[in-house]
C-alpha cells in the first residue's frame, strides 16, 4: 500500500509486515546496485548460538548481478478496488446452487461467513454492498492475460523500498515524495545532504507498480463466470 490505509497496521500491508526483510531483499534485486537498498541483516533466530544457525544466514548479495530482477507490484491501492460484492455473488450463484453444483455449495458455505466477517469489520458498508477484495486473483489475472489485453497501466522503475526496522512502520512501502533534483555525480554511496541515498541515479530500486487495469468494475463478475463456467 502506498497511499491509502493498510490492512494490518496503519502503514504495513500483510505480506510486507509479516516478513519485511524478505520483501526488502527481493525489491533490492531490481536495483542496478542492490547493495544500495539491502536492509540491515537481522540477528540470528532467538536461542541460536553463534555458528549454530544454517550458514550463510542472509548473506549479502554480490556487488553486481548478471541482470536486474523484474518485479511488478500490486499494492492495495489497486487491488482493493477490485471486488466481488455480496449482492453480485448471491445473484450469480442462485441458479448455480439450484442446479445442485457441489462447487457452488462449497464456496457459498465459506464465502457467506467471509462476507459476514468483512461486514462486521466495516463501518460504512453493509448488506449487498459488502465486498471481498480480490488481491491474489488480480495478480494471477495479470500474469495470464497481460500480453493480450489493453487497459493495464504499470508505472516502471519506481524506487519503492520496504521499512524493516521501524517501531511503528514495519513493512511500510517508502517512496521519496520530495521534489529534490537527482544527483548527477557517479558516486553510488550516500553523501552529505542525501541521507538514505535517495538522490543518486545509480542507487535505489526499480519496481513496477500497477496503477490501472481493464477490469476495475467487471473483474469480480468475470472471475465468477470463469470459475463456474457460466
Question: What are the functions of these language-model segments?
Answer:
Residues 1-230:
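N-terminal acidic, glycine/proline-rich low-complexity segments
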Amino acid at each position: 500500500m502506498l497511499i491509502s490505509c493498510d490492512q494490518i497496521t496503519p502503514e504495513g500491508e500483510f505480506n510486507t509486515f509479516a516478513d519485511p526483510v524478505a520483501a526488502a531483499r527481493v525489491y533490492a534485486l531490481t536495483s542496478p546496485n542492490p547493495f544500495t537498498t539491502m536492509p540491515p541483516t537481522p540477528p540470528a533466530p532467538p536461542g541460536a548460538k553463534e555458528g549454530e544457525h544454517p550458514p550463510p544466514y542472509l548473506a549479502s548479495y554480490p556487488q553486481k548481478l548478471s541482470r536486474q530482477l523484474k518485479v511488478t507490484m500490486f499494492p492495495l491501492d489497486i487491488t482493493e478496488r477490485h471486488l466481488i460484492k455480496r449482492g453480485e455473488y448471491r445473484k450469480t450463484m442462485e441458479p448455480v446452487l439450484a442446479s445442485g453444483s457441489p462447487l457452488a455449495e462449497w464456496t457459498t458455505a465459506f464465502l457467506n461467513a467471509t462476507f459476514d466477517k468483512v461486514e462486521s469489520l466495516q463501518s460504512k458498508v453493509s448488506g449487498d454492498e459488502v465486498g471481498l477484495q480480490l488481491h491474489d486473483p488480480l495478480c494471477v489475472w495479470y500474469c495470464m492475460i497481460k500480453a493480450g489485453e489493453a487497459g493495464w497501466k504499470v508505472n516502471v522503475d519506481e524506487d519503492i523500498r520496504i521499512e524493516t526496522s521501524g517501531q511503528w512502520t514495519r513493512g511500510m512501502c517508502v517512496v521519496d515524495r520530495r521534489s529534490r533534483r537527482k544527483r548527477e555525480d557517479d558516486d553510488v554511496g550516500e553523501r552529505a545532504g542525501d541521507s538514505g541515498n535517495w538522490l543518486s541515479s545509480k542507487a535505489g530500486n526499480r519496481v513496477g507498480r500497477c496503477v490501472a487495469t481493464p477490469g476495475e468494475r467487471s473483474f469480480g463478475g468475470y472471475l465468477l463466470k470463469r470459475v463456474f463456467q457460466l
